[in-house]
Amino acid sequence: MTYFPEEVVEHIFSFLPAQRDRNTVSLVCKVWYEIERLSRRGVFVGNCYAVRAGRVAARFPNVRALTVKGKPHFADFNLVPPDWGGYAGPWIEAAARGCHGLEELRMKRMVVSDESLELLARSFPRFRALVLISCEGFSTDGLAAVASHCKLLRELDLQENEVEDRGPRWLSCFPDSCTSLVSLNFACIKGEVNAGSLERLVSRSPNLRSLRLNRSVSVDTLAKILLRTPNLEDLGTGNLTDDFQTESYFKLTSALEKCKMLRSLSGFWDASPVCLSFIYPLCAQLTGLNLSYAPTLDASDLTKMISRCVKLQRLWVLDCISDKGLQVVASSCKDLQELRVFPSDFYVAGYSAVTEEGLVAVSLGCPKLNSLLYFCHQMTNAALVTVAKNCPNFTRFRLCILEPGKPDVVTSQPLDEGFGAIVRECKGLQRLSISGLLTDKVFMYIGKYAKQLEMLSIAFAGDSDKGMMHVMNGCKNLRKLEIRDSPFGDAALLGNFARYETMRSLWMSSCNVTLKGCQVLASKMPMLNVEVINERDGSNEMEENHGDLPKVEKLYVYRTTAGARDDAPNFVKIL
């Protein structure tokens, strides 16, 4: 065998950015393992309990970018108890001890303390990017520490976090020498910000390309900021209220006209329909538009704006857009690739804001559509069959019918054939969420056709264990399976042990799994953590009642090299 110099091998490895590929080459021999671990610059950890933080830091001491995910995805729907875990502290502490060159940290669904942010800010002299998504546990004091000490910060991105507001001081903690910001997003912070500090910060950030403001930022402040950021590409507006002064909006219009590079808009907090006309001149150049925080706008307001966005590729909107509004999307946005329609708070029984008609219209008019999240109150098989034929390039298809177990609204039949068409026609489908009245037949279709599927979400579906077994046996690339309120039990859980060797995780809540079944799984698969979650009182009542084979309230199963975690609360039992 011919051996290349280590420098040559490392150079070859640099052409393998995908973590999966690098993991593979590290298994070839000890020499390659050493070269790969010392040259790895980016590490992704999909489950913070799958491996110990110290082990990651020891293996990859030269890592520059670290991504860690915490709580299961169903935490977004309040199905994971608040104190379940997902703590960022051990990861930041391990990195501070062993990865001194860390420059970027991204965390999702994790509990991040102010103390951890303080440690982060003081430990990495070349730290450049902090991205926190759906995290909690920290306050603006932690952000103040990051602003004060991370003097090379390029990106501070706070998305959908629960942040305790302790005043507007944090924004003034960026030193005068901080001129490196490229992206700043604090839209999720609920408190006031210091307008003067914000204006000064953006004024000395010539490379700023993305800025997303919270609802406390006034129109007048927004106009002043935009005059200082003519190269902005992504803007999250502040508060566009009905109580406005015309002079401020004219200033805003003048400032927006100078933003020739702007391609994405979001925000529109408490937006007044009157203010939208000031945005119209920008619409023709937009490729991204997020109107999901604008409940004050009705279908007419939305369509007047969207009809002008002829280059739009990504649209997030509330269901108040209506089917007619989606027809406007279909006729105007021919390049649309991603559509998300979220439920609004206002709903009248018997009235559906968006239905199968709007979805079919978009599929007909937007042939490039490949990613969908669609909340609605009704659907038909015929519509789903049409959508599948019109848009066979879906990689993500998430349909959420808000009334559990609702059948085809026309035929009253299960929606098996509709979802069957989706998995049959969309060969590259990687993520799927299904809902409505569904039998085991739909899972037979999924197991047979969804060969590229990596994540499947199931709610209120299926007849028997056979449904889940179709998926476990057929979907060879499945990484994450999450199920709620479905009749799958021990036979499905224990039907294919080998599948757990390649899956990242399984979540089951309000199903028919018993404690005995969980114990069998844990004994057969020692590389798994089998977590039984009993929120009711944290007692061991399930263990004490073996005779009736009590059902498990919630089950979380995941592969791990770390063994049982040591921070589990008393309502979590790790078998």
Curated annotation (Swiss-Prot):
Coiled-coil intervals = none
Assigned keywords, A-Z? Auxin signaling pathway, Nucleus, Ubl conjugation pathway
- Where does the record place the region Interaction with auxin-responsive proteins? 76-77, 343-348, 400-404, 459-460
Which Gene3D superfamilies would you find in this protein's record? 1.20.1280.50, Ribonuclease Inhibitor (3.80.10.10)
Please state the pathway this protein functions in, per its UniProt record.
Answer: Protein modification; protein ubiquitination
Q: Does the keyword Lyase apply?
A: no
| CDD domains xrefs | F-box_AtTIR1-like (cd22159)
One GO MF annotation is:
inositol hexakisphosphate binding
Site annotated as Interaction with auxin-responsive proteins: where? S134, E160, F375, R484
Q: What else is known?
A: The myo-inositol hexakisphosphate acts as a structural cofactor.
Q: Please report the name of this protein according to its UniProt entry.
A: Transport inhibitor response 1-like protein Os04g0395600
* Species name: Oryza sativa subsp. japonica (Rice)
